[in-house]
Amino acid sequence: MAVKAPWLGFLLLVSLWGLSTPALLLRRLREHIQKFQESSSLHPGFGLGHGPGAVPKQGWLEQPLDPFNASDRRTFLQRYWVNDQHRTGQDVPVFLHIGGEGSLGPGSVMAGHPAALAPAWGALVISLEHRFYGLSMPAGGLDLALLRYLSSRHALADVASARQALSGLLNVSSSSPWICFGGSYAGSLATWARLKFPHLVFAAVASSAPLSAVVDFSAYNQVVARSLTQVAIGGSLECLAAASTAFTEVERLLRAGPAAQAVLREELGACGSLDLTEDQAELLGALQALVGGTVQYDGQAGAPLSVRQLCGLLLGKWGNRSRSTPYLGLRRAVQIVLRSMGQKCLSFSRAETVAQLSNTEPQVSGVGDRQWLYQTCTEFGFYVTCEGLQCPFSQLPALPFQLELCEQVFGLSPASVAQAVAQTNSYYGGQSPGATQVLFVNGDTDPWHVLSVTQDLGLSEPALLIPSASHCFDMAPMRPSDSPSLRLGRQKISQQLQDWLKDIKKSQS
């Protein structure tokens, strides 16, 4: 029997010591932005998802650890949140916000687009935290024997079970349509929930959903480079060239020997030694993640930098321009990100990364890192590379270097990772999932949109590509500064849901 976990309140799930590896840096950045938006949304005057005095309810569901084996009686407690302040009856729509690879707080039902849509339909808003993340942790730690119960298929079984259990617990009518919302990996889960359980899930809105698993995600940095040239968000060809120049200088200093490396370490506010090639690759990967993360979350509340600001730094538009260089601009960008996220230094130790990811004890700081690495090794890949000759950044860390983590931490070979990725696409259908009544929403500056659906697959599988929008921006709390294209995109989402809900009312009358 799982032990009920206490609510730990608002935790900024960010390491106090440093950022390490590209993937971990992006996770820290995502968590930082998510927590900022969730905590800000609960203050009066921010967002449009709730009224004064609104209090979300927290609950726990007892779920089977292995839903595919009826003889296994082990269970765990899965956390959910409820916002019923706009609910007008038993047969109203239910908006289910599916959690992804991280913790879910009360803001998951109080802020963002699903919560903002609720008043128009008198909808009930629920969020469901993903197994093995946040406080929805099975007892026993994170060793391999337990991680075998962590997969998208297990998560979907949880969604189906929760949908049925919550209908009874919350007195939801059998005629109420359930609409799944999710962003990024959770957007894929929303799609697949509709695909696998059409009798339980009426429709889905999949935001920035990377439906196609891929081992070598070289297209990520191709989109980053293209987005750095977009004038609408403050980019330019000169900005891209400056970014390339900055990385060339970092690589020159790394090759110049110990003295130059010591200077580089001090100037970047980095912690640790650069003696080992593997640590140099980690540093270059972290710097790429900083640039990529700026593009990925451009313009969002809580993001340390925007593309416009980053390009301004790289091009020396602030301060003494005559003394500025792209490398100096990159240094300033690193300092801004570290300061914004409360970091002591930029970490790049491969040995420390492996040790951290090999720790089987659930951690409050850095929660979810080992779990998400396991899912990339056993289902999705998503290893960002920049190995082509046209890459504007560093060609390190290369794909083999990244795949080594799967072997070092879990004993999984590159061949097994490739096989797992192929099986994922075969099972779900990749970018042609064949699910009806799913709206795919993406932003064209988001590097992940190339793995999603950006053109209509049919009348019941529409796609919406929002100009100049970043990752999951449509799900973020509304702000007065939102662009006209983002506002229009949200209106189109609302209209599509209205059309689908009209159809169900016609069929019931």
UniProtKB/Swiss-Prot annotation:
It holds the Pfam family Peptidase_S28. It is found in: Cytoplasmic vesicle. Coiled coil: none annotated. Expressed predominantly in cortical thymic epithelial cells, with highest expression around vessels and the thymic capsule. Keywords: Cytoplasmic vesicle, Glycoprotein, Hydrolase, Protease, Serine protease, Signal. The active site is at residues 184, 446, 471. Residues 1-22 form the signal peptide. It is an enzyme of class 3 (hydrolase). GO terms for molecular function: serine-type exopeptidase activity. It comes from the Eukaryota. Glycans are attached at residues 69, 171, 320. One of its GO terms (cellular component) is endosome. The keyword Signal applies. InterPro entries: AB_hydrolase_fold, Peptidase_S28, Ser_carbopepase_S28_SKS. Its EC number is 3.4.-.-. One of its GO terms (biological process) is proteolysis. Protease that may play a role in T-cell development. Belongs to the peptidase S28 family. This is Thymus-specific serine protease. It comes from Mus musculus (Mouse).
